């Protein structure tokens, strides 16, 4: 199976004026309702499992069309209504001035005592973060497009030129640590790409091993280390590299329910961020490993780890890894025969297999045999 760069399917262009227009339209709506003597309100798409579904055609977890109405003249709603307007004004200022703020900074910048009262606008960041998510859903824009960011996590290594503001650099010339993925990647451009595909790797240790073994250069691959669950910035970057630059996406995680869930969120999106799946998820992604079949195929039986928790056939079960496996068995996006086989084998054998277990063969085995052979032979899960 020869991987090669395909044709771009979409082109993203960040336009701050569109974000400002959406903010202003919503603000004018509230203003007109006040002028007309009406009770102003926001319609907020409802969060929660009851308003989430799997779109089989798009292969994405999506948010449904249920709305909750938040009124100003309602004791139960008034505080959140006020907080929403405060953060709308703050976002407008950030976008207009071209500045960015972290979630923590957004909280502190808008926390103050309301004049003439003993009430604070926000008591804790747990109040401001959900309002920012509400704005994402109401406006149909990413938090990052509103110039609000989270901490950096994950890094990129490979022969790709990245333009970040006024800086331009090759991600294979920055040392083994590569380029740290920022909280927002909306402004990032890719003037030159000399790779055939993206290999998304769960652990930094495995990514470092592949870099040390010269895998990116030899296989013309771009390595993206997620360092655990992929951050929004990493997921958005993966999405853009596939849809805008035509790069195939292959995911490599531990062979356990947590690693498979990491793959699931990259491919289909997540329930918590269902409203962002079309901008964060990459349904065309494929999975190379680790799988239960790898254990016997490569003679790794003696380096497996036991699943954590109580099995379903024992008193108090299922818990831990077993509970997550059963949940994944029932996910609509894991109903194909290939994934049903892997999940059922994990339950039957009661084991998990880590990426690093391949070092039992040799340090270079993963880079020179395991990955190249599986990818070349097309041994990938959907």
From Swiss-Prot:
Single GO cellular component term: chromosome
Pfam families reported in the protein's UniProt record: TOP6A-Spo11_Toprim, Topo_VI_alpha, TP6A_N
Binding site for Mg(2+): 202, 254
Coiled coil, from the record: none
PROSITE patterns, per the entry: TOPO_IIB
Family: Belongs to the TOP6A family.
Known partners and oligomeric status: Homodimer. Heterotetramer of two Top6A and two Top6B chains.
Name of the protein in its database record: Type 2 DNA topoisomerase 6 subunit A
Species: Pyrococcus furiosus (strain ATCC 43587 / DSM 3638 / JCM 8422 / Vc1)
Encoding gene, per UniProt annotation: top6A
